[in-house]
């Protein structure tokens, strides 16, 4: 049998046991710690309210069983991720409503408190998307396409204010598309960008 122990923070322990013709007693040692540190942008941009509202820091591992944790990012880029089972994790910056999560490193949690800073490569694109009359495009899935390389595309969903945040890996001009309709372009050069995009007139 596979025995899994779960709590409010997810899977705490999982192990296979064999039951024959007698009672079985099994103890599980659950060790967990926390990660503290600070995120900075490689491009020199500062964190904004938009960044910290729309992005989180996440830890994820696959072995010996899947486990993940998420935590908010503070205005100065600092974070504290609690209740992390001992083990080695990928550290990600996760953009809300998007599929453009960015790996910023790995960390091994093997003590009560671990401290490490991480640098985010790439560029944040903060968008508020409205229709031709200025109404927010709520809960819509857009594609975000590099105009010079159509294979470089990402997808994101807007929130209840028509807003979204993506982290892209390289500068360029990108077009936001809802199905076959254009909602304008964003040009990224050397810093994070915040824009309002409006549906193009036919």
Language-model-detected regions and their locations in the chain:
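Structured interaction patches on ligand/partner-binding surfaces of diverse proteins
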Residues: 6-26, 95-116, 121, 178-202
């Amino acid at each position: 049998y596979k025995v899994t122990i779960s709590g409010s923070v997810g899977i705490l322990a999982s192990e296979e046991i064999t039951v024959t013709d007698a009672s079985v007693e099994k103890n599980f040692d659950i060790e967990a710690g926390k990660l503290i540190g600070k995120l900075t942008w490689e491009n020199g941009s500062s964190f904004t309210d938009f960044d910290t509202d729309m992005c989180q820091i996440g830890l994820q591992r696959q072995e010996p069983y899947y486990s993940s944790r998420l935590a908010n990012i503070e205005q100065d880029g600092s974070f504290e991720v609690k209740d992390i089972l001992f083990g080695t994790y990928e550290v990600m910056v996760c953009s809300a409503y998007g599929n453009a999560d960015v790996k910023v490193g790995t960390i091994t949690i093997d003590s009560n408190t671990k401290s490490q800073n991480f640098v985010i490569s790439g560029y944040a694109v903060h968008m508020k998307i409205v229709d031709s009359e200025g109404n927010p495009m709520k809960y819509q899935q857009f594609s975000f396409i590099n105009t010079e390389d159509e294979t470089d595309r990402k997808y994101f969903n807007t929130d209840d204010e028509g807003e979204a945040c993506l982290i892209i890996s390289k500068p360029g001009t990108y077009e936001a598309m809802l199905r076959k309709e254009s909602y304008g372009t964003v040009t990224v050069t050397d810093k994070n960008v915040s824009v309002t995009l409006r549906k193009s007139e036919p």
